[in-house]
Amino acid sequence: FSCAIFDGAGRLVANAPHMPVHLGSMGESVRTILRQRARDGRGIKRGDAYALNAPYDGGTHLPDITVIMPVFVEDDTPSFFVAARGHHADLGGIAPGSMPPYSRNIEEEGILFDNMLIVDDGNFLDAAVNAHLTAGDWPARNPALNIADLKAQVAACQRGASALADLSAAHGVRTVAAYMAHGQRQAETAVRQLIARLDNGKFRYAMDNGAEVAVAVAIDRTARHVTIDFTGSSATLPDNFNAPLPVVRAAVLYVLRTMLDDPIPMNEG
């Protein structure tokens, strides 16, 4: 599992850096909630929590479910977000473990959560979540375990939200937000300084299934900007061994992070 804190715009602020693919893609999950809830007629409310594992909206593979909780401090606009992503033992699909190598569509992989409300006014929606887990041709094999894990993730988010509320009460929400932004700018500066020392390059990697990954790195030292271009890579494979954009982005960001000697935080910067 991975836990993280985000600012009001869904940008990563702090995390426990144990699972890079989780943390580099979780921000897109939070921003999906912000984007979709802004136009759904209900909006984001106090006491809410949402579940998401949709690969094209910030998820990785379906067993990794992200629970996202808004943190309200002063008004009806979330000041921050907290999230907990946990790998579930099984989420349905055509094979136990929900990672079938021969799946051809998302339903065969398992149960999809795409911005589902699972906590309303502080109450976990047991019946709705259980109905969702047991729906479809290949439902979850142990929904009670999934619900227990989701409740643990909700509890982790509640603890983080409470700590952020206490911090904001002690120092002021604007001060807390300002220091979050400062940490992001510090990380950005460190990465831009690294980029200025890198060289252009082109690489190809052959996979054991016959596919190839092509990577071209273009450095602009003046702007301290890097472009990573995957043009020339093999087309989408007809199975589940593909990487959606948030996962690709997470991999690229972590490579840059590992090249830094400075003890900077892993955040949106």
What are these regions (language model features)?
Residues R11-V13, G27-P70, R204-A206:
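Conserved mixed alpha/beta core segments that line enzyme active sites in large multi-domain catalysts
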Residues P20-I33, A89-S98:
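A short, polar/charged loop-to-alpha-helix boundary motif
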Residues S233-P265:
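Alpha-helical support elements that line or immediately flank enzyme active sites
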Residues L112-A190:
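N-terminal leader/propeptide and maturation segments of large enzyme subunits in energy/redox metabolism
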Residues Q158-T236:
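Accessory "access/gating" subregions that flank catalytic or transport cores
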Residues T77-P139, T236-D239, A250:
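Gly/Pro-rich active-site capping loops and adjacent beta-alpha segments
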Residues F1-S2, V67:
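Short loop/turn microsegments at loop-to-beta-strand junctions
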Residues I65-E74, A83, A218-I219:
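A short, hydrophobic, proline-anchored segment that marks a local hinge/packing element in signaling
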